[in-house]
Curated annotation (Swiss-Prot):
GO terms for molecular function: GTPase activator activity; phosphatidylinositol-3-phosphate binding. Coiled coil: none annotated. Residues 634-741 form the PH domain. The gene is BEM3. It holds the Pfam family RhoGAP. It is found in: Cytoplasm. The keyword Lyase does not apply. GO terms for cellular component: cell cortex; cell tip; cellular bud tip; cytoplasm; incipient cellular bud site; mating projection tip; plasma membrane; site of polarized growth. This is GTPase-activating protein BEM3. Residues 209-230, 382-391, 420-478, 752-764, 816-829 have a biased composition (Polar residues). Residues 796-815 have a biased composition (Low complexity). Its main location: cytoplasm.
Amino acid sequence: MTDNLTTTHGGSTTLELLAQYNDHRSKKDKSIEHIEKGTCSGKERNPSYDEIFTENIKLKLQVQEYETEIESLEKVIDMLQKNREASLEVVLEQVQNDSRDSYVNDQSFVLPPRSAERKAHIKSLNLPIPTLSPPLQQGSDVALETSVTPTVPQIGVTSNTSISRKHLQNMILNDEIEANSSFSSPKIINRSVSSPTKIHSEQLASPAASVTYTTSRITIKSPNKGSKSPLQERLRSPQNPNRMTAVINNHLHSPLKASTSNNLDELTESKSQQLTNDAIQKNDRVYSSITSSAYTTGTPTSAAKSPSSLLEVKEGENKALGFSPASKEKLDDFTQLLDSSFGEEDLVNTDSKDPLSIKSTINESLPPPPAPPTFFSPTSSGNIKNSTPLSSHLASPVILNKKDDNFGAQSAKNLKKPVLTSSLPNLSTKLSTTSQNASLPPNPPVESSSKQKQLGETASIHSTNTLNTFSSTPQGSLKTLRRPHASSVSTVKSVAQSLKSDIPLFVQPEDFGTIQIEVLSTLYRDNEDDLSILIAIIDRKSGKEMFKFSKSIHKVRELDVYMKSHVPDLPLPTLPDRQLFQTLSPTKVDTRKNILNQYYTSIFSVPEFPKNVGLKIAQFISTDTVMTPPMMDDNVKDGSLLLRRPKTLTGNSTWRVRYGILRDDVLQLFDKNQLTETIKLRQSSIELIPNLPEDRFGTRNGFLITEHKKSGLSTSTKYYICTETSKERELWLSAFSDYIDPSQSLSLSSSRNANDTDSASHLSAGTHHSKFGNATISATDTPSYVTDLTQEYNNNNNISNSSNNIANSDGIDSNPSSHSNFLASSSGNAEEEKDSRRAKMRSLFPFKKLTGPASAMNHIGITISNDSDSPTSPDSIIKSPSKKLMEVSSSSNSSTGPHVSTAIFGSSLETCLRLSSHKYQNVYDLPSVVYRCLEYLYKNRGIQEEGIFRLSGSSTVIKTLQERFDKEYDVDLCRYNESIEAKDDEASPSLYIGVNTVSGLLKLYLRKLPHLLFGDEQFLSFKRVVDENHNNPVQISLGFKELIESGLVPHANLSLMYALFELLVRINENSKFNKMNLRNLCIVFSPTLNIPISMLQPFITDFACIFQGGEPVKEEEREKVDIHIPQV
């Protein structure tokens, strides 16, 4: 009874002392925090810590000097008052001798020398859990040297001794000294982990040499940041009000009172575990090095001594040791012992009748023992009975904080190379009451973060196996008791996460066989600058879309790396290259979309994944979901589109991503929620663009929208638009069909301009792109080629009839009735020529073109080819979203018979020659519009006109001349002004034509040619010559000459090339008058003819060599032209 009162009285006294110290420490921390904040927030430069420290030392020395001087003066005065007869010199000498003696005494009181026997003179708070029986203590010295058992700090209190304040302070100070010595350096820690016995023997062999302790710098450390063991962190928290209660309980319920038989069993088990330490430490050196510091304080020497003798030695030492200033400074670190113990979580076992629980006699209020530095190797799973861990092992941070230890034996089978696993689930029957009282230390240190990151995914999946094992043990289910503020410390249950995902899964891993995945778009943009991949999950049975989600390419690659690292033998296709995601070319976009579809299809074709991989895939498809907002009432269609504008001299023609929204008859294009383009469909024409492999713009699933800004003029805006799939294109065209206005058909252009057409228009001569609204449209997903079969009637008759209109080089018969005679003579063999043409182009889809003025005014018709050889099946037409485009009756068309394109501008060269032509130099056949322009320029000295082809004429007059040529096919430009004067003597001067107007008309005709100047088929041949001889212009000229003489270039194209380049040569020769040298001509005609400068320049420089059989111009006589026009 007296002992209990004494203990209670000592405990209350200690609590009061700790409360006072805690207040002192809080004030000190606030002061330090205030100093640090003031230093960081100062605008002006404040002195550094080293400068302040140096100044502080100087001031302290100065104050000490002043105090010493004052003390000496006081002694002198005192001695003079006592002995007035003594002289001043004698008194000063005596005072000086006294000061020297006191200084020597202070110096000898600093620190005792460090000797090999210092362990015996230090108060050790670490006592082993198992107490050795007397026979074992006497006869098992070898075992003591080779086996280090887990220890827990205890405070020895005898029955007849009370815990005084001074006694407690001495114990705390000694614990600090022991802790600091164990954390002396990482090198010593690692050595102690690998061989505790060896490091102990080295310490015993060290000479008894005195060590001088010096401090060059004081470091302000937060109490929470000390490198302490988990046990020390738990016991040193100043915020824990029950910290002294725990210390006292550690003594009252010390493991020294446990039965010797139980301790002997656990010691035997620890010996078997010690044999596997070396192998485990190699794999988990980080964890071992962190946790081992908590156990190196207890040495075999201290374990060999009896508890009673050890307490007596330490008690005697505490009496001899007092509090010096140095020890008080060390006491400042005491709060680090108390910081982390506040709010931990214990596991308390419910009623259990397991026989194994007899081993543990420790009270439930006892704090958990520290974890041992090692854990069990999976290689010993076959000998589980002989290697059962101690109860304290189950709470080891090495086991519980190591992610891979949550693997069970079953989950390890799913991996080809299973990682290191623990036998914890298989050893659940060995759990004792002590393991249920064990609480988990704080989170692992920073050094192990990289290892946890690699193993984190596996632990989150298989950790439920550990929970299930704990709950199914024979000892009963675990019961968690939370103390106040217990959320800051994790426990066994908090670390072992559930197998279920922490996020809701839309599809469970076992349901992968019921879904299929489809990549909808790689152009999706969701509030980010980078494009994402939009993916849909579709129910395999019903075919309906379940939900959508978007992923960046970075996240896609992360999943790919994860699967290939966990399942190396999984046959997965390669993801698209990074270059494919850095371009917006429609063909490249289509390619990467197909590759991604194949990739995800192969993933979901795998019958079964390991649990961790399956959960990772389920989390991948269940995050970043995209909720499709309800479409607005005025929105007919919306989606991502690729847009390209026609190229100019200063602009580019690259593809850009736009989000299109069709509202009523207006198509709005947005770039990052900013409206950039607005297209009015009621005054626009639409034509399809075929998918050709040699398209240099990479057009795929595209169409052209031409918006006419103002009727009567040639001003129009062209928009080249591509979708990601052909089905998506048909959906857009189906939505557009409701807003095409037939009244705008007269102003629709019949073909795309030559300067902004892509290679999709590079069909053979005589083929055309039909406009949307007067053409049939393919309903299948196959590449659709657009052509006009109605214009190919009888080439032989056409040529013979057109030759009747040829006159001499000075004039031409401009009678327009010749065209009607031509139509009458050519109608007989129309059907025969049509069948022949279809036989040659069986893979093409025919499109009928209605561009005549009369038929265009009637209606805009869309017809379907009913030929049996058409690859478009009836089923595909019915299923096609664009079938409403094709339901327009073609009965009105059949009554009028076949229609012939009668427009000059925009028609092929052969068509223009059939309609009207002239002989140039009695050799070359030229369309009438070209011949009339050349005639006017030569007769009116246009080749000497300054700025010819560079200065633009009146757009109104040019448009008027275009319409007249389209209707009359031939207009005498040399007499045009006279006809204007004859009609109206007071006509405005703006109606007259000039050199710049005629040159602008010629450029307009060349720009509207649906094919290249020398033919689309011959383009690659000329380009090959340039590429092979790009540094040798002479060889380029000779190569062009061979191509011209070989007859590969059709006569019609050759005639136009000869006439045009001869004109440019003569303009270049008069460059001193017209200021149009070779460089300026190349700048103007390269975009007009849609050919690069490197291909255009030889035709002008070496005209005589290429067309007239002359010699190439010598290298020194050539004019250097260094021009680069973008996208030409």
